[in-house]
Amino acid sequence: WVYQGLILNCFQILPVATAFVGFAIARWQYKGGKKSAAVVTGMAVVLAVWGLFLVVHAGDDWRTAMRYKFLAKETLPDVDQNGVRFTPFDVAYNDMIQKFGSAEFSISRNRMHAVDIDGSVGFVAPVTPEGVVGTFFWKQDGFMVFSDQPGLQPTNRVKRVKQPFASGEGMLILDDIWRSLYLRDPFCFYPEIYYLQVGAEEFVAVAPKIRYAYEFPCYWVPYWAGTTIVDSSGKVDSLTREEAIADPRFKGKRLFPQSLARTIVESQKFDEGFFSGFYQRPGLIRIPVLPGGQQMPYLYRTHDGKDLYVIATEPAGNSSALFRLYMIDAHNGALSVWELDPAKGILGPDRAGERVKSISGYTWGYTHDLLESFPLPHQGILYWKYTVSVISGTGITFTAVVNTTNGEIEIFHSREDFDDWLAGRARKKPQGFTPEMEKEMQDIRALLQGALKKIEKISF
């Protein structure tokens, strides 16, 4: 906390110190009868503090944008058909909770991450001790794992992996994994801990490290400084970026810090200089706020097996057209960008979601909601994939993909139906089968179930 709270924030303390000293001088002048001078001093202090905050905060973004340059791409790589994230984060978490029964342990959505599972995309959440006694004396008791692999039956997607960790999350004082990390390297920042599969039922904790490079006169620029690995025995290995990338256990897997990927893209509003982020100009970007709790970047696997963090941006202002799609290699941090002409009106994620909400028969925001605006490049066309779920996020009502060029919507009522479309196979359900028809069928089933219950009562 000394490093992060004092050293990294030393330049942000400067405006506060300036304000304190300046207003002390103004107060002294006011008491001495120099009221006009006190007013002038006070106004000067306000301007100085505002200017210092501006230089410090915006300057960090500006220097970050100058450090990280994106390679322009002419085309967008197609998605891997076996690596599409079909199940949203919230639905996967609720499925884990439903199948997890324990009074002494718990799983937290804040500790759950999307990672590679059995060669496909999935989710892993650590099983951590619960309660005052448990957090001091019990160990992190393995993981809940959700596999989003195609072809699996819903009952086989969630499993419990028993792998106690000697140093883990939710374990206080000496066994706390955060303590182990900062004892190994106190002069860095660990934005996240997630767990990668290195065997059939074996995982290791992965903690990417971020350090800050000083740039004159008062800027700190973040960079990926390596990765710390903690195994179940509590052994801590600190790897450089090159060592982590070359480690055969993590071949092609997520290593680059997700939060740093977002920071780098956010800084691109200053890509044309310090003042370029403060006025409306061609090329100024914004990252839209998406429906549901999960925001970009999303982890996306290409047809050649690369995992990418993808962040879609729109022109700053009131435009909702897709402008740039930033891609950061989740394994080695390579940067690329796909730029479109906003005048062509390619649908961005928020406006495409409004198209899905135009489907009648659902009370959006009360009974049903959209989850995860997921980018889905397929056969040379970019789609946005949405999951429509009940408001609690406990199940999937249907899945929709929106064509970004013409706004057409495809509806899928099952994972098999979606996989058939993705693979170019003939879909088993008729094209005219709509969400409204599905809702009517659900209502009829509910009426029939109610009638059967009444018959059973009468028979009894």
Locations of regions flagged by a protein language model:
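Soluble extracytoplasmic regions of secretory-pathway and membrane proteins
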Residues: 1-460
